[in-house]
From Swiss-Prot:
K(+) binds at E45. The keyword ATP-binding applies. Its cofactor is Mg(2+); K(+). L-methionine binds at E58, Q106, D241, K272. GO terms for biological process: one-carbon metabolic process; S-adenosylmethionine biosynthetic process. It is found in: Cytoplasm. The gene is metK. Residues 106-116 are annotated as: Flexible loop. ATP binds at H17, D166, A167, K168, D241, R247, K248, A264, K268. This is S-adenosylmethionine synthase.
């Protein structure tokens, strides 16, 4: 039997974190290609450090001449991302950074398997959902994201001009009878404007927004606060630490509350099952929980490169299932085509909807009118209930 009383911790990082900046650039490149051609192939990696952003990887369009034209857009894409995030500091400014572009055409050997609707690579992918939040996400990661998203809003609006883009949050929540009831500790580190600002000064800025975001009653007199615990945090972003695409895969998913197959998302077009099948797994797990078939659901799928159908489907309802897990496994396979093409079509993934996923979580977000976060819909519940 799983534990019911415990403390669990998850962290998030802001859009200005060096790794997240790289995720944003990689997904912005992807969106640019998909806006031109829904079948574009992109595997874009980004590296950022003091005064420099390097972009590389494989891309493909049906028209080679158009591909060459798109390569010339990369410099502007990078600068637009850095500007939107808010970096205008001396050693990392969107106007003055050096941008190096090493993107090249996708390997024909990879393309030949994918063009036949096979998976773009082998691998395992996990989806998860639970009833801890209205979004059916684990509470520690969901609220860690919410804190940083709120701080970014007030920074960008000019409401809090002393905040800067680079930030991290971490919440330790106490669970009672399997439900989150109290914040045991809050860790918040944020880049700020002036060296003379103390940890207390920064806490005075951020605390009202943290209290606004967290459920009423969760913060108590016993809650520990650690705001900028090392003191000054003026030098930040890629000028403070180098960044790489795909280094925040736990932040991107469930905050450690569920397994992860190891594949990153950002910069990958939806033929890559690292991304699309992980989205499908979340979609299915969320619909299982939304349908009332379980309070918690972990779902795994696996693929082989060039092979269309998943090799396996595994479901664990952690003792909360209303029906046997094997029945749910059969039902999800019956209700959704889990070939790479089937996933792309069911979730309408071949569109420029990815830059927005690059910070504050790929899951637990509201489905959007243009198809963004389509994997967060709960429109499969009736079909699942009929199938079991």
């Amino acid at each position: 039997m799983s534990r019911m009383n415990y403390v669990f911790t998850s962290e998030s990082v802001s859009e200005g974190h060096p790794d997240k900046l790289c995720d944003r650039v990689s997904d912005a490149v992807l969106d640019t290609f998909l806006a031109e051609e829904p079948t574009a192939r992109v595997a874009c990696e980004t590296f950022a450090t003091t005064g420099r952003v390097v972009v590389g990887g494989e891309v493909g369009l049906s028209d080679p001449q158009k591909l060459d034209e798109f390569m010339e857009r990369v410099d502007g894409i990078v600068r637009d991302c850095v500007k939107d995030i808010g970096y205008e500091q001396q050693e990392f400014h969107w106007r003055t950074i050096e941008v190096q572009n090493f993107l090249h055409r996708q390997s024909a050997h990879i393309a030949q398997g994918v063009d036949k609707d096979g998976a773009g690579d082998q691998g395992i992918m996990f989806g998860y959902a639970c009833r801890e939040t209205p979004e059916l996400m684990p509470a520690p990661i969901q609220y860690s994201h919410a804190i940083l998203r709120r701080l970014a809003e007030v920074r960008k609006s000019g409401q809090e001009p002393d905040l800067r883009p680079d930030a991290k949050s971490q919440l330790s929540l106490r669970y009672e009878n399997g439900k989150p009831v109290e914040v045991r500790s809050i860790v918040l580190s944020t880049q700020h404007a002036h060296e003379e600002q103390t940890s207390d000064d920064i806490r005075a800025i951020v605390e009202p927004y943290i209290r606004e975001v967290l459920p009423e009653g969760w913060i108590t007199e016993a809650t520990e606060w650690w705001v900028n615990p090392t003191g000054t945090f003026v030098i930040g972003g890629p000028d403070g630490d180098a960044g790489l695409t795909g280094r925040k895969i736990i932040v991107d998913t469930y905050g450690g509350a569920a397994p992860h197959g190891g594949g990153a998302f950002s910069g990958k077009d939806p033929t890559k099952v690292d991304r699309s099948a992980a989205y499908a797994a979340r979609y299915l797990a969320k619909n299982v929980v939304a349908a009332g078939l379980a309070e918690r659901c972990t779902l795994q799928v696996s693929y082989a490169i060039g092979v269309a159908k998943p090799l396996s489907i595994y479901v664990d309802t952690h003792g909360t299932g209303q029906v046997d897990a094997a029945q749910i496994e059969k039902a999800v396979a019956d209700c959704m085509d889990l070939t790479p093409r089937g996933i792309r079509e069911h979730l309408n993934l071949c569109r420029p909807i990815y830059a927005r996923t690059s910070a504050y979580g790929h899951f637990g977000r509201a489905p959007e009118a243009d198809g963004g976060f389509s994997w967060e819909r709960t429109d499969l519940t009736d079909a699942l209930l009929k199938a079991v």
